[in-house]
């Protein structure tokens, strides 16, 4: 898998933005990606050094349309901790 296929998008919420002060960033990643693949992709795309990585599989929520029941898609979140000497990831500092 290519690095740009592994990292889907940053997750920008109030909680994730509070963690950026401690050099922790949250991304939505491909559900099939492993921790070593995610670490390599982050280091390759953003040119930083990753010191820690946590992942969480999030189930899809149940949604209804009348009597029909379906689910939203499941996703995997990766919380990346950068080393002290790494630069910040710029997409989180805009706005």
From Swiss-Prot:
Any GO BP annotation: translation
Any one GO cellular component localisation term in the record: ribosome
GO MF, any single term: structural constituent of ribosome
Keywords: Ribonucleoprotein, Ribosomal protein, RNA-binding, rRNA-binding
Listed Pfam families: Ribosomal_L23
Record Gene3D superfamilies: 3.30.70.330
Quaternary context: Part of the 50S ribosomal subunit. Contacts protein L29, and trigger factor when it is bound to the ribosome.
The protein's role, per its UniProt record: One of the early assembly proteins it binds 23S rRNA. One of the proteins that surrounds the polypeptide exit tunnel on the outside of the ribosome. Forms the main docking site for trigger factor binding to the ribosome.
Protein family (similarity comment): Belongs to the universal ribosomal protein uL23 family.
Identification of the protein by name: Large ribosomal subunit protein uL23
Annotated organism of origin: Leuconostoc mesenteroides subsp. mesenteroides (strain ATCC 8293 / DSM 20343 / BCRC 11652 / CCM 1803 / JCM 6124 / NCDO 523 / NBRC 100496 / NCIMB 8023 / NCTC 12954 / NRRL B-1118 / 37Y)
């Amino acid at each position: 898998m290519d690095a740009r296929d592994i990292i889907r998008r940053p997750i920008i919420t109030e909680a994730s933005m509070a963690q950026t002060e401690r050099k922790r960033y949250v991304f939505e990643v491909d559900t099939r990606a492993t921790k070593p693949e995610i670490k390599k992709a982050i280091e390759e795309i953003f040119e930083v050094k990753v010191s820690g990585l946590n992942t969480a599989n999030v189930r899809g929520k149940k949604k209804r349309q009348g009597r029909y029941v379906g689910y939203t898609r499941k996703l995997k979140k990766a919380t990346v901790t950068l080393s002290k000497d790494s630069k910040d990831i710029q997409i989180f500092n805009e706005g």
